[in-house]
Amino acid sequence: MEGRDMLSWEQKTLLSELINGFDAAKKLQARLREAPSPSSSFSSPATAVAETNEILVKQIVSSYERSLLLLNWSSSPSVQLIPTPVTVVPVANPGSVPESPASINGSPRSEEFADGGGSSESHHRQDYIFNSKKRKMLPKWSEKVRISPERGLEGPQDDVFSWRKYGQKDILGAKFPRSYYRCTHRSTQNCWATKQVQRSDGDATVFEVTYRGTHTCSQAITRTPPLASPEKRQDTRVKPAITQKPKDILESLKSNLTVRTDGLDDGKDVFSFPDTPPFYNYGTINGEFGHVESSPIFDVVDWFNPTVEIDTTFPAFLHESIYY
């Protein structure tokens, strides 16, 4: 019962203090409104007005001090509240909203808090200017890419980098809109590479891609740079060496042969054969372009200036086979 009575008494006391403070504040407000202008001849002495206002301010502050102490502050260490005089700023234009003054504890005004104490907006503006200058200093180049009919007309060919589309807008005088891309790792790896894609008005299969800045992210290390345009791209394929066909070689060999027939009329036995087989490794001439072995039929003295020596001991009908 005693606890309930104590609680009821504290509530009544708190309510009474709040009412007293509210009344004092209303009186002060009324006096400030009724205060005549300094130019009025019927104004009361300035000292009396100042003393009355000071008393009302002290009553308001004291009433709210006791109210705060009653709001469950009894268990915490005693806090000494220093009353701060309230400065009343007259409103020049009653129709406009006055600027909120600084609070008692020195916290910033509401508009300062909205923009981060006046520094966040300036920092954001400085960052924007810095990034704009940084983008203008990046290298810039353009390429034209033609889309093959098999791939359709959805966009330019992939340039092996990962891009993210962040905007598109219509260009004055152009039939097709312009698309804007930036590196996927802009936020994570601070890569400022961007590109713009514009479809040609004259040929819908041609896209003009404008790059600005090179990739500084991990893609630049693991991937190759963008392909050049078809006009600038050089054919780096290895062309096979042009070789002469075996039939042409044999025809050239037959037309350039020089046959020595010295000693054909000698009385030697034309049917005496040497120990070496007459057709030893003859197949190397027809299909293989490697080392040509010598045989009793003919010896190739020089591959580019062939001279054939006929063995006089070999039958004459085999000599004629060289020419046909």
From Swiss-Prot:
PROSITE patterns in the cross-refs: WRKY (PS50811)
Main location per the UniProt record: nucleus
Where does the record place it? Answer: Nucleus
Highest taxon of the source?
Eukaryota
Single GO biological process annotation from the record: response to salicylic acid
* Induction comment: By salicylic acid (SA). Strong accumulation during leaf senescence. Down-regulated by jasmonate. Triggered by P.syringae.
Recorded hits in SUPFAM superfamilies, A to Z, give: WRKY DNA-binding domain
Q: Which InterPro entries match?
A: WRKY_dom, WRKY_dom_sf, WRKY_plant
Pull one GO CC term from this UniProt entry.
nucleus
Task: From the UniProt entry, list the residue stretches annotated as the region Disordered.
Answer: 93-126
- The keyword Amino-acid biosynthesis is annotated on this UniProt entry: no
* DNA-binding region(s), residue ranges: 152-220
What happens biologically when this protein's gene is inactivated, per the record? Retarded leaf senescence, but no effects on pathogen resistance. Increased susceptibility to P.syringae associated with reduced PR1 induction; stronger symptoms in double mutants wrky46 wrky70 and wrky46 wrky53, and triple mutant wrky46 wrky70 wrky53. In these mutants, higher induction of PDF1.2 upon jasmonic acid (MeJA) treatment.
GO molecular function terms here? Answer: DNA binding; DNA-binding transcription factor activity; sequence-specific DNA binding
Arranged from A to Z, the UniProt key words for this protein are: DNA-binding, Jasmonic acid signaling pathway, Nucleus, Plant defense, Transcription, Transcription regulation, Ubl conjugation
The answer to keyword Transcription regulation applying to this record is yes
Q: How is it modified after translation?
A: Ubiquitinated by UPL5. Ubiquitination leads to its subsequent degradation, thus controlling the timing of leaf senescence.
The record's section on Gene3D superfamilies has:
WRKY domain (2.20.25.80)
**Protein role:** Transcription factor. Interacts specifically with the W box (5'-(T)TGAC[CT]-3'), a frequently occurring elicitor-responsive cis-acting element. May regulate the early events of leaf senescence. Negatively regulates the expression of ESR/ESP. Together with WRKY46 and WRKY70, promotes resistance to P.syringae, probably by enhancing salicylic acid (SA)- dependent genes. Contributes to the suppression of jasmonic acid (MeJA)-induced expression of PDF1.2.
Share what the entry says about its subunit structure, partners included: Interacts with ESR/ESP and UPL5. Binds to WRKY30.
Give the family from UniProt.
Answer: Belongs to the WRKY group III family.
Note the PANTHER family from the entry: WRKY TRANSCRIPTION FACTOR 30-RELATED-RELATED, WRKY TRANSCRIPTION FACTOR 53-RELATED
This one is known as Probable WRKY transcription factor 53
Q: Which organism is it from?
A: Arabidopsis thaliana
